[in-house]
């Protein structure tokens, strides 16, 4: 039986988590990717309101669907890469994690990436509304998230580095070999 190495990649939305995880998955053939976004956990009725401070909100998210898939994959793959915004902070997942990586990307880049990714076919009014929300509340949520989640990450990488450099840095720092 294989004992899985469980690597969580964390960061704010549009920070580069998914891109890095997909590249790790290509590099490590005997791996599985589990992504928080695939479960719409933040849309469950039990999810805390967005304005709830991340320190209070993190363990209010119901991870049972994600955990079910994780536990069925655990020890069947050499590596499990989890695209998960909260690093070690959720008690349901924490004890299974081998290492966490926090992708720290400047918030102006995050904002621009999110507009390009999520608003490319939206109206000017919708883009302007998102910009107002970002300035009024989302930016502070992202700042709080970054501080709280990155404080106990095993590795913090610069999200502005080219992907190949990020991959090389993660592999070297975490001593990952395929």
What are the residue ranges of the model-derived segments?
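Conserved lysine of the Walker
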Residues: 17
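Conserved nucleotide-sensing/catalytic segment adjacent to the nucleotide-binding pocket
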Residues: 32-35, 41-84
């Amino acid at each position: 039986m294989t004992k899985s190495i469980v690597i969580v990649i964390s960061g704010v939305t549009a920070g580069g988590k998914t891109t890095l995880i997909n590249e790790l998955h290509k590099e490590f053939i005997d791996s599985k990717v589990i992504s928080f976004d695939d479960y719409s956990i933040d849309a469950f009725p039990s999810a805390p309101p967005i304005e709830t401070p991340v320190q209070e909100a993190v363990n209010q998210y119901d991870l049972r669907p994600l955990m079910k898939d994780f536990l069925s994959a655990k020890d069947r793959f050499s590596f499990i890469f989890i695209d998960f915004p909260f690093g070690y902070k959720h008690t349901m997942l924490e004890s299974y994690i081998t290492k966490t990586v926090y992708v720290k990307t400047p918030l102006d880049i995050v904002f621009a990436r999110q507009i390009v990714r999520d608003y490319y076919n939206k109206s000017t009014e919708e883009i302007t509304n998102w910009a107002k929300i970002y300035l009024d509340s989302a930016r502070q949520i992202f700042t709080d998230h970054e501080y709280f989640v990155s404080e106990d990450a095993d590795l913090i990488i610069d999200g502005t580095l080219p992907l190949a450099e990020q991959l090389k840095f993660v592999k070297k720092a975490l001593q990952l070999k395929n």
